[in-house]
Amino acid sequence: MNLLKKSLSVLAVAAMAVSLAGCGGSSSSSKSTESGEKVFRFGQSNPKVGLDMQTNTNSGASSVADNVLEGLYRWNDDNKEECVLAKDMPEVSDDGLTYTITLKKGVKFSDGSDLTTEDVKYTFERMFTPATGCTNTYMYNMITGAQDMLDGKATELSGFETVDDYTFKLHINYKFAPFVANLGMDYASIYPSDACAAAGENWGKGTNLIGTGPYVIKENDEQTKVVMVPNKKYHGKKPNLDRLEVVYIDDYSTKMMEYEQGNIDMCDLDTSLLDQYKDGDLKDEITQVTPLGTYFLSIKDNDPVLSNKAVREAISLAINRKELCSTVLNGAAEPASSFLNPGVPGHDDKLKTYEHNVKKAKQVLADAGISNPTFTCKVRQKEEKIATALQAYLKEAGITMNVETIDAGIWSSARAAGELQATVLGWFPLYADADNQMYTYYYSENAVGKGVFYNNPAFDSLMKEARESNDSDKRVELYKKADYILSREDYGTIPLYYGKLQFVAKPYVKNAKLGNLIYHLYNIDIDLSKK
C-alpha cells in the first residue's frame, strides 16, 4: 500500500530528526552509586492535567499520584483488589444497598494529620460538589444523595453515615455489582480534608498533593519532572527508594535515547520503535505486557458529518486492521472484533475481526448519496502514526480525514469540551469488568463528558440492567448485546486493535511492572550492586 508506506516514511524521518536533536546531560547513575542512595528515574510523557485524581482519567497522572495517594482499596499488579486504608473488605447488607467500612487506626497523612472518617466524607462530598468538576462521578453517583449534590440541591452527602471516627456506612440507591471494585480505583483516593480545602483550586498542582502513600512530592515544576522522597509517616513498609523521579519526555525517540545514555532507568517503549530495539543490545531489558484495553477511533456522533451512520460504517469498512497491526504496530497488537477487550467478560469470542472492504465502503456512501465526506482527526503525538495510517486507508474509500497533532494538554481540554470531531486513543479498564470499560465511555450521560455524544436508549437500557445485576452470567450476555449495538449496528465507535505494551528497565531495577496501563512505581527497588 504505497500511500500508507509513504506516510509512515515521512513520520520516520521526522522522528529521526527529533532523536538526533536529543537532550543531552550526563548520567547521574554513578553519583547515586557512590553515595549509596537508591535513586530511580522513570521517563514518561507529561500528562499536563495536574495530579488531582478526581478531575482527570490520565494514566500518566495516575502513575505519579499513585505513589502519594491511597484509597480504601486498590487493584494490585496482579489485578486483584486488596485493602489499603480500610481494615477489611466492606460488610454488605442483605439487600445489597449498605456498605459498612472500618478504617485502619494509626494511619497519618504525610502532613501529620490523622486519617479519620471525616476525611473520607470530605473526599466524597468534594467529588460530588459541582465546582470540583469531577470527571468520574458516574462511578460513584449511585451513593444516595450524590445526584442531589451534583444538581446543586444539597451540600452534604446524605448517603454517607458516620458511625465513629473510624467506621462509616455508604448507602446506595440500587444494587451495583462493581461498587467495591470502583472504590479501589485511583479516582477514589482519600484526601486530607483540611489540607485539600486549604489548597483550593491549587490541589494537585505543584507540591499541593498530600496523601497517606509511601512517598511525598518534594519538587514539581509541572514541566520537566516530579521529585518524590519517602513519606516518614507512612503506615506501611518503608519505601525502597531514597528518591523517586518521574521525568517528563514526550518524544518517544528522545526518551529511548535518554534511557540508552543512562539518564533514566525505565520508560515505556513505543510500539513504533519495537523493531529497532527488540533484537539489539537492549532485547533482554524489554518487557511486553497485554493490557485489558482497546484502541479505537473515537468519533463525535452528533457531528454534522459523522452523525450519518453510513459515514461511520464506511470508515470502519475502509480500515485494514490486520495490516495496521502487522506494519505500523510491528505485530504488537491484535485486530479488534469488538469494543470490549478479550480479557473482559462480555467480549464475544465468536465475532470475527471487523470487515475490511473498500469497495463496500464506497457503495455504502453511494447508497446514502454521500460524496467525499471530510472531517478532522486531532491526536496527541503518540497517536500520530496510527492516525496517519487511518488517513491513508480512508482516502482509498473516498473519505478525507485531515490529521492534526496537538499538545496533550490542549487535547484533553478539547476532548472534555466536545470539540474533537475524531481522535485516536486507548481506553483501559482498571479491572476486568465491562461496566468499567464501556459504561464509563458510551452510556449517554457519560458520553457527553468524553466528547463522543453517543446516545442510544437500547444500549443504555442494557448497560443499566447489567450494572444492577449480581448474576455474572446474565451480565456477560447483556454486555455482548450492548457491545454489538454500539460497534456493529450503530458504529458509534470504531474499534481498531487490542494493543500490547512494552517498557524497558535497567538490569538493576527490581519489581518493574505495568499494572494495566498504570506504572505502579511504589514497589520499585534498586540493586546497587548491579549498577
Where in the sequence are the language-model features?
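Detector for C-terminal structural segments
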Residues: 318-346, 382-389, 415-531
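Gly/Pro-rich hinge or "lid" segments in bacterial periplasmic/extracellular proteins
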Residues: 172-239, 243
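Short, low-complexity disordered leader/linker segments with a strong preference
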Residues: 1-40, 50-53, 83, 93, ...
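Aromatic- and charge-enriched surface segment that lines or borders ligand/interaction sites
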Residues: 88-136, 169, 305
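Surface-exposed binding/hinge segments that line
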Residues: 102, 121, 137-194
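N-terminal lobe/hinge region of extracytoplasmic solute-binding protein
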Residues: 43-94, 210-211
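Ligand-site clamp/hinge motif
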Residues: 200, 232-277, 400
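Alpha-helical secondary-structure segments
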Residues: 116-123, 165-171, 213-214, 242-243, ...
